[in-house]
Amino acid sequence: MNGSNGDSADGHRPASSSAAPARGRAGRVRMTGKQRREQLLDIGRSVFAERGYDGTSVEEIAERAGVSKPVVYEHFGGKEGLYAVVVDREMQLLLDMVTGALTGGHSRELLEQAAFALMDYIDTSTDGFKILVRDSPVAQATGTFASLISDIATQVEDILGLEFKARGFDARLAPMYSQMLVGMVALTGQWWLEVRKPQKAEVAAHLVNLAWHGLEGMERHPKLVGDRQN
C-alpha cells in the first residue's frame, strides 16, 4: 500500500495489552500515514548506513520506530522496498545538488562548483553517501553509485567539451576525461568520509588544482613512454 492511511490499522495491540513490549512502543505517537512513512524512511536510512543492507532487519527498523513489523510491510512491502526508496531519494538528492551547483561561469568555476557540491553532499548527507557506495542486490535494480557517477560525468562532459574546443583538443575525448575527473572526486570523497580532514572546501580546492592544472598540461596526442602499444 502507499501509506496514505493513518496508524489506526497498523497492527499494534492496544496499549493496555500485557503482550506489547514496553521498549520503544510505550510512548508511541500517533502519526498520519505520510508522517509514518517519512519516519520509517529516516530510520531505515540510518540503519542501512550503519549496518548495510544484509545486516538490517525489518524487526530492528520497526523497533526503532516504535511500531510493529506489519506497519513497515504496509508502507513498503518489506526491507527491499524501503531500501529502494532510500537509494532513489539519495541518488536524486546528490544529482540535484551537483547539477544545481552548476550555475555558470568560467570552466574552472564550473569544475569547482561540481567538486564542492559532491563534497558538500558527503558532508551533509553522510548516511546517504555510505548507502550509495555500498553494493547490494537491490541497488542493482534501482541504480548503482557507478550509474549515478556516470550521470554526473555527463554534466561535466559538457564543460570539458567546451574547454577542449577552446584549447584545440579533440572534443570527442571529453566523455572519457569527464569519467576520469568525476571518478577521482568520488573516490577522494570516500577517503575523506573516513578521515574528515582537511576541511571539505580545502579538499575541493586540491581536487580542482590537480584536475585543472592537469588539463592545462595536457598533450594533444599523448603516448606511453614504454613500449606498451597493445
Task: Map each language-model feature to its residues.
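Amphipathic alpha-helical packing segments from all-alpha helical-bundle domains
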Residues: 92-95, 141-165, 175-180, 202-205, ...
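Hydrophobic alpha-helical segments that form the core
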Residues: 2-6, 13, 170-191, 202-214
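N-terminal intrinsically disordered/low-complexity leader segments
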Residues: 1-35, 171, 219-230
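Hydrophobic alpha-helical connector segments
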Residues: 85, 99-124, 178-181, 204
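Amphipathic alpha-helical segments used for helix-helix packing
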Residues: 121-143, 157-161, 187-194
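Generic hydrophobic, amphipathic alpha-helix propensity
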Residues: 36-44, 61, 86-90, 94-98, ...
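Helix-turn-helix
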Residues: 39, 43, 47-81, 85
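Short coil/turn segments at alpha/beta junctions that flank glycine-rich nucleotide-binding fingerprints
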Residues: 50-54, 125, 167
